[in-house]
UniProtKB/Swiss-Prot annotation:
<feature type="zinc finger region" description="Matrin-type">
    <location>
        <begin position="408"/>
        <end position="439"/>
    </location>
</feature>
<dbReference type="InterPro" id="IPR021966">
    <property type="entry name" value="SF3a60_bindingd"/>
</dbReference>
<keyword id="KW-0747">Spliceosome</keyword>
<dbReference type="Pfam" id="PF16837">
    <property type="entry name" value="SF3A3"/>
</dbReference>
<dbReference type="GO" id="GO:0000398">
    <property type="term" value="P:mRNA splicing, via spliceosome"/>
</dbReference>
<dbReference type="Pfam" id="PF11931">
    <property type="entry name" value="SF3a60_Prp9_C"/>
</dbReference>
<dbReference type="InterPro" id="IPR000690">
    <property type="entry name" value="Matrin/U1-C_Znf_C2H2"/>
</dbReference>
<dbReference type="InterPro" id="IPR051421">
    <property type="entry name" value="RNA_Proc_DNA_Dmg_Regulator"/>
</dbReference>
<keyword id="KW-0597">Phosphoprotein</keyword>
<feature type="modified residue" description="Phosphoserine">
    <location>
        <position position="365"/>
    </location>
</feature>
<dbReference type="GO" id="GO:0005681">
    <property type="term" value="C:spliceosomal complex"/>
</dbReference>
<dbReference type="GO" id="GO:0003723">
    <property type="term" value="F:RNA binding"/>
</dbReference>
<keyword id="KW-0539">Nucleus</keyword>
<keyword id="KW-0862">Zinc</keyword>
<feature type="modified residue" description="Phosphoserine">
    <location>
        <position position="367"/>
    </location>
</feature>
<dbReference type="Pfam" id="PF12108">
    <property type="entry name" value="SF3a60_bindingd"/>
</dbReference>
<feature type="region of interest" description="Disordered">
    <location>
        <begin position="341"/>
        <end position="384"/>
    </location>
</feature>
């Protein structure tokens, strides 16, 4: 039985006690990863309680029904003593009719909350991990891996390779991304999303995903999203069409050297029929050279409303799948450390015999049950050396031997820094560098090995294109003819002599 003013006082006290608990929790040293995760879950729970108390307090201060205003007026009026004794009488009557009712102060409630926090068994209900996840240190993607193996027309990988490449979905052609593929991506995203919430409860994941959504919409409108860009495949080029400058060609035979796909793309761009043999396509395209109007007989039929509707549905389906892939890229980036640790853990388990794995599991369970305060201490690492498979810093001589003290910066990868020459050389074949080259419109071939600057890559690509253009077969200069006397001349000279009647 509380008045509005008493409720406000109680909520203010509750907020102050919650703030004190959060400060104490934040200042407490966390000896290991398990304690850190539990501490962040406790902080999140306290923040939610603080938010709820603040919302209730704000509603009371808004006083939409004017009850608070009326209560203050009654206490501050001329009959304040009569009001006081009337309320005291109500309180006595309430406890007389409810003798078992006990008012528990907030201090007792918070003491009980602190006792629960200090008991690990009671706090284990806040977050749970499987045995494979190792208390939040490793990923358990076995179920997702089984779904991946059941996908048709995808490369079959072992589990370790899958761990390091499950986000390389841009390498899968869009034609193979069917309903089963979408179920696989949704399952993988659900697991990664839930895992991030368990190991990083204080992370503003909704804000991160909102940024991903905005960035995806921008890339989709520009046609640059990985795996779905306009320049991604020849089929996409053929479907959208690309204009071709015919001024550089003097005959349809020269156009035929471009191939079926390029001719089809040019015909689609002009709205012409794109079927037929190579010669028919080349002749049809060459017949439009220098003409301002096109022959209606050469025009392609407009797609029906049914076909347009099917294309629209297919476009929306591709967009939904691409949106799921954008989330997958973000999840993989947030879990990069756990991903690398999972690979090392799986490799270490595969290198052991069955008996050694059982002994290791027993030792791990015993170490978790021990109360050694130094067991999970953060290792002494003043030089910020990388951690080995045992979770301890590697020796400094090994750090220098592998050249990990040398940093390599790659502008094509978005100014990403690689530690050591081995990681630097390996990254040219990895997804980050390949995606950067794809955004530049340059194939990631051996010609561009060790090229890290965007300007250098573009310059080299222009040079390679000019060399390829110079090596291109030119019929007028390289096609040879022989006259009746056995003289061998090129095509252009032969036609000039023929027109002049000198043959």
């Amino acid at each position: 039985m509380e008045t509005l003013l008493e409720q406000q006082r109680r909520l203010h006290e509750e907020r102050e006690r919650l703030v004190k608990l959060m400060v104490d929790e934040h200042a407490t040293k966390k000896p290991g990863e398990k304690e850190r995760i539990h501490s962040e879950h406790r902080l999140k729970y306290l923040m939610e309680l603080h938010h709820n108390s603040t919302s209730q307090l704000r509603d009371l201060y808004e006083d939409k029904d004017n009850e608070r205003k009326a209560e203050i007026a009654a206490l501050s009026g001329p009959n304040e003593f009569n009001e006081f004794y009337a309320r005291l009488k109500q309180i006595k009557q309430f406890y007389k009719s409810h003798p078992a009712e006990v008012s528990v102060p907030l201090s007792v409630e918070f003491d009980e909350m602190i006792r629960v926090y200090n008991n690990p068994d009671d706090m284990s209900a806040l977050v749970e991990f499987t045995d494979e996840e190792g208390g939040g240190r490793y990923l358990d993607l076995n179920e997702c891996y089984e779904l991946y193996l059941n996908l048709r027309s995808v490369e079959k990988l072992d589990y370790i390779t899958y761990l390091m490449s499950f986000d390389h979905v841009f390498d899968i052609p869009r034609e193979r991304k069917n309903r089963e593929y979408r179920i696989y991506i949704e399952t993988l995203n659900d697991y990664l999303h839930h895992f991030i919430l368990r190991i990083q409860p204080l992370l503003d994941l909704e804000g991160e995903l909102l940024k991903v959504e905005l960035d995806f919409q921008r890339q989709w409108l520009m046609g640059t999203f990985p795996g779905f860009s306009i320049k991604e495949t020849e089929s996409a080029l053929a479907n959208t069409g690309a204009h071709l400058d015919l001024s550089a060609f003097s005959s349809w035979e020269e156009l035929a050297s471009l191939g079926l796909d390029r001719l089809k793309s040019a015909l689609v761009a002009l709205g012409l029929k794109c079927g037929g043999t190579l010669e028919e396509r080349a002749q049809r395209l060459f017949s439009t050279k220098g003409k301002s109007t096109l022959d209606p007989a050469l025009m392609a039929k407009k797609p029906s409303a049914k076909t347009a509707s099917a294309q629209s549905r297919e476009h929306e389906r591709h967009k939904e799948i691409a949106q799921l892939e954008a989330l997958l890229y973000k999840y993989a980036d947030l879990l990069s450390e756990q991903r690398a640790a999972t690979k090392e853990n799986v490799q270490r388990k595969q290198a052991r015999t069955g008996g050694e794995r059982d002994d290791s599991d027993v030792e791990a369970s015993e170490s978790d049950n021990e109360d050694d305060p130094d067991a999970d201490d953060v290792p002494y690492n003043p030089k910020n050396l990388p951690l080995g498979w045992d979770g301890k810093p590697i020796p400094y001589w090994l750090y220098k031997l592998h050249g990990l003290n040398i940093s390599y910066n790659c502008e094509i990868c978005g100014n990403f820094t690689y530690k050591g020459p081995k990681a630097f050389q390996r990254h040219f074949a990895e997804w980050r560098h390949a995606h950067g080259m794809r955004c530049l419109g340059i194939p990631n071939t051996a010609h561009f090995a060790n090229v890290t600057q965007i300007e250098d890559a573009i310059t080299l690509w222009e040079k390679l294109k000019s060399q390829k253009q110079s090596e291109r077969w030119v019929a007028d200069q390289e096609e040879e003819f022989e006259d009746s006397l056995g003289n061998v001349v090129n095509r252009k000279t032969f036609e000039d002599l023929k027109r002049q009647g000198l043959l």
